[in-house]
């Protein structure tokens, strides 16, 4: 596989600001965003038969499509079920990401992925922005963005995602930590500072 000019990973728990940060960097600095979550949604269609075979007809809605809410409730209530889903989805997502990188070899890339380390995507990145936020702030954001999500489910998701950054020793990687507990204007300024540091470093490498 050829090498893109610059690849930045953006990771963090649910509602930590991954999409917002990726959008800022894409728009301001000319990066192409690869959104692993969106690729994961496409896998539900592509691997529908295999997923239904694993979890049964109970995950289908009235249109005979996989109901994302039903599937989410199922896998976040049982870690074994989550691993079954990941065993199907992760190899496909990884393959899609590598294909996009090949198709855009002259382009600067953002890889937006909550499970960046779990999927070994850090191996593709020059820098990784790790977003963190207080649980209380994450819960408020989720209550606003997903009105029908209950606090029980939020707690289960946060518990599962608790250690997504620390599953392995991180060496030879440029990690950039950002605490996203404030407003958009503050986050935008933080991103500008971090990106200027990256640009300056790359210029003299």
Curated annotation (Swiss-Prot):
It catalyses: 3'-dephospho-CoA + ATP = ADP + CoA + H(+). The keyword Kinase applies. Pathway: Cofactor biosynthesis; coenzyme A biosynthesis; CoA from (R)-pantothenate: step 5/5. It is found in: Cytoplasm. Residues 7-205 form the DPCK domain. The keyword Nucleotide-binding applies. This is Dephospho-CoA kinase. The gene is coaE.
């Amino acid at each position: 596989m050829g090498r893109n000019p610059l690849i930045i990973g953006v990771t963090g728990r649910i509602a930590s600001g991954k999409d917002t940060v990726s959008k800022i960097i894409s728009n301001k600095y000319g990066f192409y965003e690869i959104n692993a979550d969106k690729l994961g949604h496409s896998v539900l269609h592509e691997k529908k038969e295999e997923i239904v075979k694993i979890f049964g007809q109970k995950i289908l809605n009235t249109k005979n499509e996989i109901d994302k809410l039903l599937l989410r409730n199922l896998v976040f209530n049982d870690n074994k079920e989550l691993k079954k889903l990941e065993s199907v989805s992760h190899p496909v997502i990884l393959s899609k990401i590598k294909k996009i990188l090949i198709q855009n070899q002259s382009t600067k890339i953002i890889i937006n992925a909550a499970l960046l380390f779990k999927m070994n995507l850090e191996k593709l990145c020059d820098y990784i922005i790790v977003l963190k936020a207080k649980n209380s702030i994450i819960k408020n954001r989720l209550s606003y963005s997903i009105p029908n999500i209950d606090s029980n489910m939020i707690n289960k998701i946060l518990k599962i995602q608790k250690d997504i950054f620390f599953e392995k020793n991180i060496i030879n990687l440029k990690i950039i930590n950002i605490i996203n507990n404030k407003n958009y204007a503050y986050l935008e300024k933080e991103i500008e500072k971090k990106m200027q540091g990256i640009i300056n470093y790359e210029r003299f490498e």
